Amino acid sequence: QLIQAFIELKELGVEEFGIHALLASNTVSNDYYPELARQLFELAVEVVENTGVHLGFINLSGGVGVNYKPEQEPNDIAIIGEGVHRVFDAILKPAGLGHVKIYTELGRFMLASHGLLVTRVTHKKKTYRTYVGVDASAVNLLRPAMYGAYHHITNMDRPEGPTEVVDVVGSLCENNDKFAKQRELP
């Protein structure tokens, strides 16, 4: 279908083409991005050989993840870049596609480690669970409420010491306004 779509678009007068993919989000492996590049570069060669279109760019999208949990190893962007460069040289250059621009969308990778949400505990409630209420909410950090994303929480007043399992909840009257569920914290 993709080859046919390129052919039909070329027949309609489109002159500049590109390939863009979004296959994963927040991968924490140095191997993912070079493998994605290999697949897209091979696809690009196939498209150009079968359609004769001028391919101007390949967008590898995002996907290079960050270590949200302290025990996770961070991605090494130099290793990732070397891997992409290797497959570029092995696949695109021999096919005469060394001119193709390579784009990325690495916003999370570049910025995630620079953002913090600082909030205060406003109350603690014990029922069938222990809830720690804070003066922030999903309005300030939507990812945990929206799809359960993990964000590390540090108790700046007492980073060490006895811990307890708690839910850290926001100030909204919504059952999913939670920054952490059943998290062991000091």
Where do the model's predicted regions map?
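Short, surface-exposed linear patches
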Residues: 1, 39-44, 80-83, 124-127, ...
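Active-site-proximal beta-alpha core segment in soluble small-molecule metabolic enzymes
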Residues: 1-57, 66, 87, 92
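Active-site glycine- and acidic-residue-rich loops that bind
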Residues: 1-3, 26-39, 79, 108-113, ...
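Short glycine- and Lys/Arg-enriched binding-loop motifs that mark or flank ligand-binding interfaces
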Residues: 14, 20, 57-61, 103, ...
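Active-site beta-loop-alpha junctions enriched in small/polar residues
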Residues: 21-28, 58-65, 107-109, 137-139, ...
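Short glycine/threonine-rich loop-to-helix capping motif typified by GTGT followed
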Residues: 29-36, 67-80, 111-125, 181-185
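Acidic/histidine-enriched ion/cofactor-binding microenvironments in catalytic or ligand-binding pockets
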Residues: 47-49, 53-56, 75, 79-82, ...
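Charged (often Lys/Glu-rich) extended helix/loop segments that serve as interaction or gating elements
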Residues: 97-186
